[in-house]
């Protein structure tokens, strides 16, 4: 793991800029240097352990269903961002182009653009299929994600950090954790490669 203190400080600054209304933000702002130093050393030495996360039930008006969120504490969110900062380029390199999941530059807007382009061709297609895996995050076990990560990384300490993140989620991908959509897209990419 190679995140240095300036990178960690930038991650902390970004995280607290989006969460002005929480009490822990004032503490993080006042002690950003110390927290950044501690987080960098915890991640480098492998001593970081996530705290129990807050659980929340919200109603998603768009999908007309209830969602069970797990919200990690701010320190753990910064750790997730630091770990994923080094993982995301490798996931994006292996990502299936037509997988329009919830990651930047690959959401609904890309799906609509793809469909528009396909429909403009001279021979329009007769059928189209849009699929959504029912409760995909909750059904994706941690060992499957670790198996996919082992195909990319050989560094045991870095894999151990990912295992710790997955343990903090509760053994399955949790809605509300920053790494969850990235892990889901990684596993989908490997599944598509197999078939």
Regions found by a protein language model. Give the residues of each.
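Non-catalytic, well-ordered alpha-helical scaffold segments
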Residues: 6, 33, 37, 76-81, ...
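Glycine-/proline-rich flexible loop or hinge segments
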Residues: 14-27, 59-70, 96-97
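Short coil/turn segments at secondary-structure boundaries
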Residues: 24, 51-59, 94-100, 127-131, ...
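Reverse-transcriptase-like RNA-dependent polymerase core
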Residues: 42-64, 78, 153-168
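Active-site-proximal segment of RNA-dependent polymerases
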Residues: 80-141
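Conserved polymerase palm-domain catalytic core
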Residues: 116-195
